[in-house]
């Protein structure tokens, strides 16, 4: 007998140790969760009970003799360490080539057609921290009306604009234009709208960010679940990451706690299928800013909410906690890190056992399909037979 429902929660960037090829990405020695625990007095009693301390050594978070969940970790086989490819691999789509990166900004063959299409010049066109570049160029943007374009170590084309200078809907239109232009060798993973408000010296990015992702080039777990007549409910930026494909219902969120609330709301409805949630604050607000204390506080805040999710599980449910990459806030880099991701699987019918090290995130997609009884022929090897009582 299979399960009725699986809830996947991606703790965005909560990596658990450098992958063997991490040095190729400049990430040798990274371990997001362990280094946070080594730096601050991290207390995660509920995750500890599930077995997070059994996955990787954590100061102050010991392994437990009998974890409440199945535990393990997964390696990535995708080329890259970004949000989109990480989530796609979780859903059974492994990319052989990484998305293009622009460490020196975007070339004229990208910028010139974009400027012509929107009827404005762009400011910036370089890699930058989003909060830094709006402080640097925000006043000029307000004076000229020209949007700020920037990138990062991720495959992203980001457009920042003050909401009173370029209305948000117009900013979204610019992003759709960029998305249409960024194809072929320049097919970046995401075009991102980054609206902000305020005055020079006091700019604040708003929660009206929107991602315009590439559509997955091949089917994913989400398509398989929909094809089987089940629901796929997306919380947070999941809908954007998959460009809306394979999703029956979705809701954006303001922050991690809203993400937990919206996940609970979908759970209350009792629909059969998949709830797929991304909690982005760990990465966006703390990892990229090297804010160790903030990252730790966000982990503890999620840990306090975890019992609500566990208590809401029905007999034929499973809750899966994992991540998409690392973003070690204790290293000089402010970029993602190439890491293993944790795997905790809890449910009334789930055996609490050591899953070990899975060779690809795609094993999770195959396992979820198996747990739901969904026909599936994508990459990855199911370990569902280990899990079910």
Swiss-Prot record:
**Annotated positions binding Mn(2+) 1:** 12, 324-325
Q: Which species is listed as the source?
A: Moorella thermoacetica (strain ATCC 39073 / JCM 9320)
Q: How is the cofactor bound?
A: Binds 2 manganese ions.
Name of the molecule in the record = Phosphopentomutase
Q: Which InterPro entries match?
A: Alkaline_phosphatase_core_sf (IPR017850), DeoB (IPR010045), Metalloenzyme (IPR006124), Phosphopentomutase_DeoB_cap_sf (IPR024052)
Q: Kindly list the positions annotated as binding Mn(2+) 2.
A: 283, 288, 336
Q: Per the record, what are the reactions this protein catalyses? A: 2-deoxy-alpha-D-ribose 1-phosphate = 2-deoxy-D-ribose 5-phosphate; alpha-D-ribose 1-phosphate = D-ribose 5-phosphate
Q: Which GO terms describe its molecular function?
A: magnesium ion binding; manganese ion binding; phosphopentomutase activity
Q: Name one GO biological process term.
A: nucleotide metabolic process
- Localization (cell): Cytoplasm
Keyword annotations of the record = Cytoplasm, Isomerase, Manganese, Metal-binding
Q: What is its EC number?
A: 5.4.2.7
Q: Which NCBIfam families match?
A: deoB (TIGR01696), PRK05362.1 (NF003766)
Required cofactors, per record?
A: Mn(2+)
Entries under Pfam families matching the protein? Metalloenzyme
Q: What does this protein do?
A: Isomerase that catalyzes the conversion of deoxy-ribose 1-phosphate (dRib-1-P) and ribose 1-phosphate (Rib-1-P) to deoxy-ribose 5-phosphate (dRib-5-P) and ribose 5-phosphate (Rib-5-P), respectively.
This protein's GO CC annotations:
cytosol
Per the record, the pathway is: Carbohydrate degradation; 2-deoxy-D-ribose 1-phosphate degradation; D-glyceraldehyde 3-phosphate and acetaldehyde from 2-deoxy-alpha-D-ribose 1-phosphate: step 1/2
Lineage, opening ranks:
Bacteria, Bacillati, Bacillota, Clostridia, Moorellales
Instruction: Identify its protein family.
Output: Belongs to the phosphopentomutase family.
Question: Mostly located where?
Answer: cytoplasm
């Amino acid at each position: 007998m299979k399960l009725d429902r699986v809830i996947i929660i991606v703790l965005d960037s909560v990596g658990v140790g450098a992958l063997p090829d991490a040095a190729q990405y400049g990430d040798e020695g990274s371990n997001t969760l362990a280094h946070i625990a080594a730096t601050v007095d991290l207390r995660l009693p509920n995750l500890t009970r599930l077995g997070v301390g059994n996955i990787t050594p954590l100061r102050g978070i010991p392994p437990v003799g009998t974890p409440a969940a199945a535990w393990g970790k997964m390696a990535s086989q995708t080329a890259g360490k970004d949000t989109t490819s990480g989530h796609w691999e979780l859903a059974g789509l492994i990319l052989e080539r990484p998305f293009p990166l622009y460490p020196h900004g975007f070339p004229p063959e990208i910028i010139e057609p974009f400027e012509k299409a929107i009827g404005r010049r762009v400011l910036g066109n370089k890699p930058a921290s989003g909060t830094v570049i709006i402080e640097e160029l925000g006043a000029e943007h307000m004076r000229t009306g020209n949007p700020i374009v920037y990138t990062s170590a991720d495959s992203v084309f980001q457009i920042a604009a003050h909401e009173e200078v370029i209305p948000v809907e117009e900013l979204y239109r610019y992003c759709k234009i960029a998305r249409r232009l960024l194809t072929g060798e320049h097919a970046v993973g995401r075009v991102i709208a980054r609206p902000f408000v305020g005055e020079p010296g006091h700019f604040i990015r708003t929660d009206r960010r929107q991602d315009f992702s590439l559509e997955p080039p091949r089917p994913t777990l989400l398509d398989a679940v929909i094809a089987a007549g089940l629901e796929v409910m997306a919380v947070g930026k999941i809908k954007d990451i998959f460009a809306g494909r394979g999703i029956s219902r979705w809701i954006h969120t303001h922050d991690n706690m809203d993400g937990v609330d919206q996940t609970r709301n979908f759970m209350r409805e009792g629909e059969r299928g998949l709830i797929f949630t991304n909690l982005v604050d760990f990465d966006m607000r703390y990892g990229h800013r090297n804010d160790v204390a903030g990252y730790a506080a966000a982990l503890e805040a999620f840990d306090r909410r975890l019992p609500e999710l566990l208590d809401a599980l029905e007999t034929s449910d499973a809750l899966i906690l994992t991540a998409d990459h690392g973003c070690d806030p204790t290293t000089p880099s402010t970029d993602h890190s190439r890491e293993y991701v944790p795997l905790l699987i809890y449910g009334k019918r789930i055996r609490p056992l050591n899953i070990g090290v899975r060779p690809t995130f795609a094993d999770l997609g195959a396992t979820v399909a198996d747990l739901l009884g969904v026909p599936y022929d994508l990459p990855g090897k199911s370990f569902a037979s280990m899990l079910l009582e």
